[in-house]
Amino acid sequence: MKVLLALLLTGFSTCSLAQQSLPNSLTGEKGDPARGRSIVVNRQVGLCLLCHSGAFPEEPSQGDLAPDLRGAGARWTEAQLRLRIVDPMHLNPATIMPAYGKSEGLWRVAPAFRGQALLTPQQIEDVVAFLATLRD
């Protein structure tokens, strides 16, 4: 918990509304795109496909509330993707997308999940690495 908070504070120290990104990896290393893909399609972990859709033929039921993930790597840099995952409300205060990298300052969190981020810093980096590969 303290490590995640420290990483987030370090990342946010280099983030501004003008640049709209988190340029530094939360782990200091690149993520693994294969692990990131498995997080995105896993409804028990990433929850991404509840709202998003994409080229995931193994998942017939996909969301339509949020942008299609196809071409995410062409639309946003890794730094922009990272911020969108860690704290999407930083970019859009009205978003319904959860802050996958925050554990404080949230509301309507089930008691069992209070004080926990939805994804670890490594999982976030893996998802960023995967989304960055989606160029078409």
Segments the model singles out, each with a brief description of its role:
Residues 34-49, 60-63, 116-122:
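Sequence context surrounding c-type heme c attachment/ligation sites in exported
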Residues 36, 44-55, 81, 127, ...:
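The canonical Cys-X-X-Cys-His
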Residues 1-4:
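Positively charged n-region of N-terminal signal peptides that target proteins for export
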Residues 19-43:
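Electrostatic cytochrome c docking/interface patches
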Residues 13-14:
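N-terminal signal peptide c-region/cleavage motif recognized by signal peptidases
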Residues 35-39, 68, 76, 80, ...:
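Extracytoplasmic/secreted proteins, especially bacterial periplasmic and envelope-associated proteins
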Residues 102-136:
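C-terminal capping alpha-helices of c-type cytochrome domains
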Residues 29-30, 53-90, 96-110:
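Gly/Gly-Pro-rich "capping" loops immediately C-terminal to redox-active cysteine motifs
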